[in-house]
């Protein structure tokens, strides 16, 4: 789990969600694979399901495009899921989060 993913997971747990890491590492290809090619974390709580893609703030637009092009994206929305981007950045020496809901 990357540092940014760990930050998002900790934040969601603090907000009262149950959170699962849904990306995995393929040791043969030495690459990470997201759920449906676009989701890093899946959270449930407060009567909702939230799919989260975690990145740095500078890559938000690329990740937004990646999610919107994913075959599973329309079905996530039809299923009532919230799909959210977490873009982390440092301000001074404190981490800040920019959250974008799709």
What are these regions (language model features)?
Residues 1-102:
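Catalytic phosphate/metal-binding cores of nucleic-acid and nucleotide-processing enzymes, i.e., regions
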